[in-house]
Amino acid sequence: MRDKVNINTVDISQLEVFFQPAKKPAKQTIVFAHGFSVHHSYFKSFSETLVDYDYYAPLWPGHNHHGFTDKELSPIHYAHLLVAWIEKQDLENIVLIGHSMGGAVASYALQFLKPQRVEKLVLLAPLSYSNLLNYYKIKKAFKKKDEKLSYFKRMFQPKFPDLQNDGQWQMELDKHTAMCKKLTFQIFKELSRLNSAYKTITIPAFLLLAQHDDFMPTKATLNYFNRFLIKKGNLQSGVILHSQHQMFNSKHESFCKAMHDILKHNKLSKIY
């Protein structure tokens, strides 16, 4: 079901958007929707290879430098921001890529965008009902305090370049953890609507999964999307072997090959 929202009234003044211009005459535009509890720079290993594309990566409320309200912590709200920003920029011929929670954001956004805006959708280990199967694995991820802090420092160094010691980092981590709990609640609350959003996708869609993903159960997600969600004529799906949730980092070369096939040839092999 579509939200009754006027995209023209959505305030995008606080939305941070990273831009990397094409080094060659741009043939297409890529817009990347990042996932849960990350900074857009975690996709840098791949985005730096996109010399033929203008590349944009928004940072959602709760993940960027600005403050936020609880009602802004929602994949649907992130989608509203994304749509309003794309419409304002008047972008067309877009390849829309969503990783993890970003897959939900991208799919919600398609419900509001004008048809000519997006040429194809790429879903990288996307959020879905299948996540419920791995709920306890997700909950236990980075369970130890030192592991949480170490991961947070690596991920959000671009956001907090001036923090001097672990005490300062821990304060930011505590605030971030509180934000994540609220966002998690909203994500689960919206899952049924996400299911409906996936079913409305009519443009070419590419589903790329990681073989050893601790967050998205690979086989269940593959079957779920192919059997119940996106129509078979619109969806191509593949799996990157020996890879983890952030497949673009864990198996970089295989991921780049898969993305090359998608971007240049509109195809996706079953295995990479």
Swiss-Prot record:
Keywords: Hydrolase, Serine esterase. The keyword Signal does not apply. One of its GO terms (cellular component) is membrane. The active site is at H34, S100. GO terms for molecular function: carboxylic ester hydrolase activity. Pfam families: Abhydrolase_6. InterPro entries: AB_hydrolase_1, AB_hydrolase_fold, AB_hydrolase_sf. SUPFAM superfamilies: alpha/beta-Hydrolases. Its EC number is 3.1.-.-. The keyword DNA-binding does not apply. PANTHER family: HYDROLASE, PUTATIVE (AFU_ORTHOLOGUE AFUA_2G14860)-RELATED, MONOACYLGLYCEROL LIPASE. Belongs to the lipase/esterase LIP3/BchO family. This is Putative esterase/lipase 3.
